Amino acid sequence: MTIIQRSTSLNNIINEKLGKIIVASNTLPITVTKFNETPLFGSPLSASRESITSSFGMSEPSRDRESKIQIQINGHPFPTQSALETLKAKDEIEDWLWIGWSHCEVNEDEEPMLNQAIKEFSPHFEHVFLNPRQFENYYKGYCKNGLWLLLHYQMNFIRMQSEWWEEYVGVNQMFAEKIASVWRPSDIIWIHDYHLMLVPQMLRQLLPPEASIGFFFHAPFPSYELFRILPNRKELLKGILSSNLIGFQSFEYVRHFKSSCARLLDLEVHPKGLEIFEDGSTHFTKLQVYPIGVDYNDFAKNLNLPEVSSRVESLRKIFKGKKVVVARDRLDQIEGVPRKLEVFEQLLNDHPEYIGKLVFIQIYEPTVEEGDETDEQKILHKTVNEMVGRINGKFGKLSFNPIEYINKKISYEELSALYKLADIALITPIRDGMNLTSHEYVVCQKDNFGVLILSEFAGAARCLGGSIIVNPFSKKEIMEAIIEALNMSMHDRKLKHQINYNYVLANTSSFWGKRFLCDLNEATQKEIMETSVPRANFQEIEDSYKKAKVRVFFLDYDGTLTPLVRLPSQAMPSKQLIDVLSKLTEDRRNEVYVISGRDRSSLEKWLGHLPIGMSCEHGVFTRQPGENQPWTESPNAEVQWKDTVLSIMQDFEDRTPGSMTETKQVNITWHYRNADPDFGQFQAKELIAQLRSVANKYPLDILSGKKAIEVKPIGINKGEIVKMILQKIDADFILCIGDDKTDEDMFKALYNVPSFTIRVCGDLEESTKARGVVESSSEVLTLLNRLSLS
C-alpha cells in the first residue's frame, strides 16, 4: 500500500502577513547552564542500560567565557518554536520574541550577566528572572503541586498554600510587565498554559484596549466540579478571559471551561465564546479548538541522518526476532507507568509464548533533577525501579531482559531511532492535554506501519482515528490491545497507520500556529460589536435631535436603561437614570416612552412620578405621557389560559432549583437566571415544548428572552405599541433602544420609518433589525444624557 501524502497550504487560511509575535511561556526553549554547574532541569542522567542507548547529544552549546554561561538549543524543539521559525521563514510573520524563564539558578547579581548571554545567543529570547523563593512557591508550589495536579485530575496529591498564590500573582505580574515593556502596536501577544493565567488581565491594565492577546491552554481543562475546588478559581478565570482568543486541545476542554465560567462568573455563553460585562463595558472572548501538532519536516529530516539509520540497524540486530513495544513517559503520576508494567507482567504470565519474543522499552524521562523530586515522585521512581527489577528477574535471562528501562533524557536522534524500530507504541496516560509522543511515533513509522495504542484520556485520541483506543484504568483492555496489535495483519496495520499519518502530515505545528494566530488577529479586529451592524453614531443622532421639532423615545427597561440583575426586584433605576429622564421630559418637544416586559406595579413604583409614557407586560397595559395619566388595557388581553400556563411553570419551578415564576396581571414569566446554566437551558427548552401544546388551544405568544420564558396573548407586542403611538404623533426624530428578542418587534415596526434603532449588545449568533449597536446600558445613559444637554 502506498502512503498518500497530503500537503497543507497555510496560505489557504489567511494571506495577510502578521506582525511580530510575542510568545510568553513559563520556560524558554533553550537549556542555560552556569559554567561547571548543572541546570535546575534538563541535564541528561546516566542510562540504566547502555546496551540500547547511545549519546548523540544536543546541538553544540554556546559558551560565554567571561560570563561563564553555557546555552544550547534543546535537541527536541518545542512545537511553538517550530511553528514560529517556519512562519518566519515563509515571511508570514514579521518576527518573533519568546519571553520565559531559563530554569538557570543564578543570584540577583548574576542576572545582568545571564540576560546578556541570552541576548548574545539569540535576539529571539527574553529572560524573566526567578529567585529561589519564587521558584519554590510559584513553580514547585502553586503550579506543580496545585494547578497541574488539579488539571490532570490528581486530587489525592493536591496541596495549596496562601504564599504560593501570592507568588503566582507576583510572577504573573513580572511576565506582564516584561511583555508590556517590549510590546509595540502591531505586535500579537501569545501566552501559553496554566503558569500564566493572570497575565492577560494584567496586560489589559498596562496596554491599550486594542492590544491583541491570545492564550493557548496546553493542559487539559477539568470539569467544573473539579475546578471549583480551587480557592482562587474566579481570579484565574477572569485573568484568562481578558484574552481575545483562548485555544484548547479538544472540544471537551472548551465545554468544561464554558461550564466553569457560566457557573462561577455567571457569564453569557455563546456557541463561539463568552460575553463578559465588566465596568460598564462588554468584551467577547472567542473560544476555539486547536489540536497541536509536530514539525513533520524536522522529524523526516532527522530520520534520514546517517547516525539515526545506523542506530536503527544496530537496534534491529539487538532485538532480532523480537517484537518491540515502546513507551515514553515523564516521571509523574499521570503517565500510568506502574499500571503498564503490571499489564506487561500479566501478559507474560498469561501468554508465556511471548517470553523471549516480546520486549518492552520504557523511556522514563525525569522532569526534575535528582534531589528536587517531590515525595510522590521519589516513591514513584522507587516503585518503577522495583517493578522493572522484579519482572526482569522473573522472565529474563542472562542474554535477555523483557523490559529495557531508560531512566534519563535521551537525544532527539535516539528517540527517532527507537520510534522507527518499535512495532507498537503504548501511550496510556491517565490524563493528558494532547501527548505528542503519539504524533512523533506515527511520523517515524512511515515505512514500518507500527500500531499505536492510545489512552482515551489523551487529547490525541480525538485526532488519531487509526489508533487502538483503551481505557488506561483497565489492565484487561490494555493487554487485549497489545495482543490485537501483535496479531494485526499487515493490511490492517497499513490502513490504520495511513489514517494517523495523513492527520499528522496535515496538522503540523506550523498549521496549528498559523491557524491560532490568524484567528487571534481576526478576533481582535472584530470583537463582539464588529458585526454587520455598525456601532451607533452618537454624533449623527445628536445632530438629528437638535434639528427636530417633535421627538419620540421608545426605551426598553431591563438591560437597556438598567443593567441585567439576578433578581427582577433588584433592577431599580439609578439616580442618574431618573435625572436623565427628567431632563428629557422638561423639553416639550420630547415624548419619552418606556416600553417594558415589566409588570405595571414595578414600573409605577420606579418611574410613575415622571411625566413619561409607559407600556408594561410587552404592550398589555399602556399609559400616555403626562402627570396622572390613566392606564389602558389591550383589547386582546384575554386570560382564560392563565391557570393552565401558571400550573406548568410552577411545576418547572419546583423541578428546577434556582428558578422562579413571575405572575403579572396578564403575562406570566419563568426566570432561570439563578438556576444551573446547563440544566436551566435544558429545562427552558422542555418548558417551551410543553407550552406550545397550550398555544395550540389558546391564542398565545411564547417569548424566549434572556434567561426567561414569557407567555402572553397573541397580537400584543412592543411593535404594536410603537405603531399605535406613531399614528398619533407626526415625529421627525425617533430613537428606539432595546436589548433582546422582545425588542426586535419595535425595530421591525420602525424598519421602514426614518429613525434611529439601537440594539444593546445582544447574542452574537442572533441577527437584529436595529441599525446600530452599543455595548452596555451605561452607553445608553451616556447617549441620553448627551441629548438631554443638547
UniProtKB/Swiss-Prot annotation:
- Which keywords does the record carry? Carbohydrate metabolism, Glycosyltransferase, Transferase
Q: Which domain of life is it from?
A: Eukaryota
Ranges annotated as spanning the membrane: none
Q: A GO molecular function for this record?
A: alpha,alpha-trehalose-phosphate synthase (UDP-forming) activity
| GO BP annotation list | trehalose biosynthetic process
Checking Pfam families in the record gives:
Glyco_transf_20, Trehalose_PPase
Q: What is catalyzed by this enzyme?
A: D-glucose 6-phosphate + UDP-alpha-D-glucose = alpha,alpha-trehalose 6-phosphate + UDP + H(+)
Q: What class of enzyme is it?
A: transferase
Q: Quote the EC number.
A: 2.4.1.15
Signal peptide limits: none
Q: Do you know which PANTHER family this protein is assigned to?
A: ALPHA,ALPHA-TREHALOSE-PHOSPHATE SYNTHASE [UDP-FORMING] B, TREHALOSE-6-PHOSPHATE SYNTHASE
Function statement: Synthesizes trehalose 6-phosphate, the precursor for the production of trehalose, the main carbohydrate storage reserve of the dormant spore. Trehalose accumulates in both prestalk and prespore cells and then is rapidly metabolized during terminal differentiation of stalk cells, while being stored in spores, where it serves as the principal energy and carbon source for germination.
The family note in this entry says: In the N-terminal section; belongs to the glycosyltransferase 20 family.
Q: Please identify the protein, giving its name as recorded.
A: Alpha,alpha-trehalose-phosphate synthase [UDP-forming] B
* Organism of this sequence: Dictyostelium discoideum
